[in-house]
């Protein structure tokens, strides 16, 4: 009995190490959002940098749109930004931004330096809308269909590969639906 009592903490520790080691091998971007095929959570937020203007969830329905959650303090957001600029310039899709817990002056400087690909940017200063969306970190991008339903959630930055092989085919399919 004494020998087992001495080995029990070691066995528990090894079990926990194995459990967490397996978890580290999983790709968090493969986690499905509970919002898929459900309406985009309603929001009505001030437009970043534009006094008196509001950005609402209703603006994202009626056509297929992208909602990109980003922040000026987010390094991965800076990495994906050139791809978003390219999409906006080519008019591939209407792109809306959700500035997540950002400081207005830092956001303004970031957009001045890097360019603004967004049709409008909602200022989620408190992070409440991001919580409603289930955001776990920036950047995250949502494809919203004509009916205002979330059809896909991209966790992490959009690069050319993700655009060409995941997002663009889904958007083309959604735009073809009547």
Which residue ranges define each predicted feature?
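A short beta-strand-turn-helix
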Residues: 43-66
């Amino acid at each position: 009995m004494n020998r087992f009592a001495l080995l029990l903490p070691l066995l528990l520790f090894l079990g926990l190490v194995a459990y967490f080691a397996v978890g580290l091998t999983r790709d968090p971007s493969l986690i499905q959002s509970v919002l898929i095929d459900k309406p985009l959570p309603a929001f009505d937020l001030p437009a970043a940098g534009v006094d008196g203007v509001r950005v609402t969830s209703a603006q994202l329905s009626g056509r297929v749109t992208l909602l990109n959650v980003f922040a000026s303090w987010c390094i991965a957001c800076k990495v994906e930004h050139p791809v978003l600029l390219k999409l906006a310039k080519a008019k591939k899709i209407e792109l809306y931004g959700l500035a997540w817990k950002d400081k207005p002056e830092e956001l303004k400087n970031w957009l001045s330096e890097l360019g603004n690909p967004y049709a409008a940017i909602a200022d989620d200063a408190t992070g409440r809308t991001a919580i409603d969306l289930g955001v776990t970190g920036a950047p995250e991008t949502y494809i919203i269909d004509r009916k205002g339903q979330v059809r896909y959630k991209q966790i992490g930055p959009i690069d050319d590969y993700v655009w060409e092989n995941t997002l663009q085919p889904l958007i083309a399919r959604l735009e073809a639906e009547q």
